[in-house]
Amino acid sequence: MADPAECNIKVMCRFRPLNESEVNRGDKYVAKFQGEDTVMIASKPYAFDRVFQSSTSQEQVYNDCAKKIVKDVLEGYNGTIFAYGQTSSGKTHTMEGKLHDPEGMGIIPRIVQDIFNYIYSMDENLEFHIKVSYFEIYLDKIRDLLDVSKTNLSVHEDKNRVPYVKGCTERFVCSPDEVMDTIDEGKSNRHVAVTNMNEHSSRSHSIFLINVKQENTQTEQKLSGKLYLVDLAGSEKVSKTGAEGAVLDEAKNINKSLSALGNVISALAEGSTYVPYRDSKMTRILQDSLGGNCRTTIVICCSPSSYNESETKSTLLFGQRAKTIKNTVCVNVELTAEQWKKKYEKEKEKNKTLRNTIQWLENELNRWRNGETVPIDEQFDKEKANLEAFTADKDVAITNDKPAAAIGMAGSFTDAERRKCEEEIAKLYKQLDDKDEEINQQSQLVEKLKTQMLDQEELLASTRRDQDNMQAELNRLQAENDASKEEVKEVLQALEELAVNYDQKSQEVEDKTKEYELLSDELNQKSATLASIDAELQKLKEMTNHQKKRAAEMMASLLKDLAEIGIAVGNNDVKQPEGTGMIDEEFTVARLYISKMKSEVKTMVKRCKQLESTQTESNKKMEENEKELAACQLRISQHEAKIKSLTEYLQNVEQKKRQLEESVDSLGEELVQLRAQEKVHEMEKEHLNKVQTANEVKQAVEQQIQSHRETHQKQISSLRDEVEAKEKLITDLQDQNQKMVLEQERLRVEHERLKAVDQEKSRKLHELTVMQDRREQARQDLKGLEETVAKELQTLHNLRKLFVQDLATRVKKSAEVDSDDTGGSAAQKQKISFLENNLEQLTKVHKQLVRDNADLRCELPKLEKRLRATAERVKALESALKEAKENASRDRKRYQQEVDRIKEAVRSKNMARRGHSAQIAKPIRPGQHPAASPTHPGAVRGGGSFVQNNQPVGLRGGGGKQA
């Protein structure tokens, strides 16, 4: 870089006119202007480099703010222009304006036009490369406006510690129209919103970067300059803008970043040792523009309305602080090898002089330390030391020049050697052009392969997302199944509690029966009338014995069922109970348990059969796939061998063809010579006296022979070139075939992986089916349980009726008993009420079981529906996999056709050389999308073929606007 120089940041102030809402509100125009550099607000003056009134045109603003910076950027300096102010103060109007209106366009479109106009007027030996970037800072994230997929770019530093946005799209341009098309494309992607103060409020800070690199083709001097054109979002008061929701979040981030910018300006103005550039991504990007190597111009946009007076004062104070900041600017020069060498020699001489000075001073110091007195003429004199160093260098240079001159004289080239060197150079240039074309083709091929790889990655990601959704659905169904199991367990537990309570109540009934027997004995002793009651009691005992016998029979049937289950399961440990005093409720529980065991055993047997059939089918599929894979591998090896043999055969045929052509040529020449000799002999016989005419005929024949020879030589050379081209094409096809084989191998691996995933999902589907079968079996068990409980309740109800009738008859018979009998009737009533309470509790439990059963029946259709949806999803995934394979096959065919078409197009294009006028160099740049304006095609330097407009551009000055 050149020597640095300091310069202040230029601050321009612009006031917009009152808008319609301010006029309707009756706001006052508070700004008063004094000259062209001062404005008065509330009787306080604010001075800037330039103050623009409301009537100032866009052209005047541009001429005073930005016109000079074009020359600076093209001379190798960095430049920045950004607009600052509150919302709706005219920042976007100042920077952009109406992009395609000659009078209403702002700074950005005008500066673009001026850059190219200035280039066209410069020396034709200069070559320019111009590239542009367009990005925004939205919610403190850097978002590329030319590629909306890049939403969170990062800020890095280059080798000179200059911040830059990594990964941002760079478009190479060669005309103002292409730049404007790029701006239109980026502006359409920028975030805007409607607020109470502005219908088109910018919700982000936009930065348009123009990077200009120039090279002098004669001196090889290289300069580079960057121009940042920044449109900041305005600071907002929520009470005025009415922002809410997402707009409110945007306003918070805007105010935060502007506050960070204000802190940086304040720190630079106060000369602080620490400047908080890293508090915001915007200040990080503009670090070089604020106190660094850059010529910076700030346009502060203000509202003249009294409604916004406080915001206007804050903006003016910001501008005054920024005006005190000094930047250190220097030219961005890339030194050539010769310049680096000169600089090295200069530093070397300087270092040598300093060493001589140090040596002289050390000698003089040692003499003084040793006690000597150094005379004045021997003391150090700077001029004398420089003169001695210059004389010594001159002698060395004279000594070195003599052998160099002798070598130069001996090394002069002859004309033949010079021509030979020029021919070699031409051949090398041609090889470079061929390599450029090959590089272009390979770059396009790599780009297409990248696109295909991204498509495959997206397809893989979607498949993985579907798999995750399926897994989540399976987990949810598993959780619901577990919950249903818990509910069934709770129901069974409730039934067990009921059985225990029933046992307790039965024990209490037995105790009360004993008490009743005692009372009956007392009644028998007191009254003979109770003998009939004893007889009836005997009948009741007989009935009880009958019930016990029936219970014993039921127990025997249950034991038979247990024995059958033990034989089916393989467990023969079922033992006969010793006692026979079990009641009906215990038998009911045992019967339910036995029926459940039977159903589970049947389910297990059925599932085992299904698993065996599934395993058999899976083994068959695996064998078929292995056979198909072996056949494919065999077919691939056969094709490779066939291609190799065909290649060798083609080479042999070409060699034979060349030999035959050479023999045909030689025979043709001999035939022509024989015909010529025959013709000469005939003419000699007919015209013996015309010797002169015969000589002329002989010359004509020789000329004809020579022309035939030249024609055959040209044909031979063209055929050889064609053979070489065919061999190259065969080599390319072999490479392509190898790539297709690798691609096929990759697809085979992918197919195996997807097949494994499919098997896993089939297994999970089978598990769900088994779970559904279990749920159905549980429903059947609950149904049987419900029927059993209903039967038991009916039995209890019948017993209750019998017991009530018995008590009624006994009460009638004992109506004439004395007052001592009242205690017995009260005990009977208490027993009746106790049994009635038990009956009510059993009825409630029955109703609860019925409700639970109904809920389970309602839940069952939902689970069946989910199971069907899961099966349909699996089918959809299988069809998607099949479609993806078909698409991959079509893509491979289309890719092969495109490669063939590109080869044919490259082969058919002619080479063209650069002219003397201005030309646009567009070497191929991988990774760029086509630019928006295809109206300016350019020629490839060193290749001569035309390419698209999405490639780096080199622009030469002095020769016109386009090639």
Swiss-Prot record:
There is a cross-link at K213 (Glycyl lysine isopeptide (Lys-Gly) (interchain with G-Cter in SUMO2)). InterPro entries: Kinesin-like_fam, Kinesin_motor_CS, Kinesin_motor_dom, Kinesin_motor_dom_sf, P-loop_NTPase. Residues 8-325 form the Kinesin motor domain. Its main location: cytoplasm. The modification N-acetylalanine is found at A2. Pfam families: Kinesin. Residues 915-963 are annotated as: Globular. This is Kinesin-1 heavy chain.
